């Protein structure tokens, strides 16, 4: 998968198109990512020890990884991700600027 936890991404399609956020979690087997502040859904929660009031909560839902693009750390624009070997290790590279993605 081209994005990992902690990456800054921009949504390129769907109801949240244009929104930016960081990846909170990645689910590689399902090719989905959880992005901060994107794809908010209402969850109905029963009263519990943690939440004695219960009620309706707003939380993020996962979106498909093909609907997000990485934000280039150098230019701040969205970019595709490439891979190259450096010191015997496979590293991710921003296609627009050639910057190595940490």
Curated annotation (Swiss-Prot):
Keyword Metal-binding: no
Keywords linked to the UniProt accession: Ribonucleoprotein, Ribosomal protein, RNA-binding, rRNA-binding
Xref: PROSITE patterns: RIBOSOMAL_L24 (PS01108)
An example Gene Ontology molecular-function term: structural constituent of ribosome
Annotated CDD domains: KOW_RPL26 (cd06089)
Any Gene Ontology biological process: translation
Keyword Ribosomal protein in annotation: yes
Disordered: annotated segments: 44-65
Source organism, top-level taxon: Bacteria
SMART domains given in the database record: KOW
GO CC annotation terms, alphabetical: ribonucleoprotein complex; ribosome
Stored NCBIfam families: rplX_bact
Functional note: One of two assembly initiator proteins, it binds directly to the 5'-end of the 23S rRNA, where it nucleates assembly of the 50S subunit. One of the proteins that surrounds the polypeptide exit tunnel on the outside of the subunit.
Subunit structure: Part of the 50S ribosomal subunit.
Matching HAMAP family: Ribosomal_uL24_B
Family under the similarity heading: Belongs to the universal ribosomal protein uL24 family.
Protein name: Large ribosomal subunit protein uL24
Gene: rplX
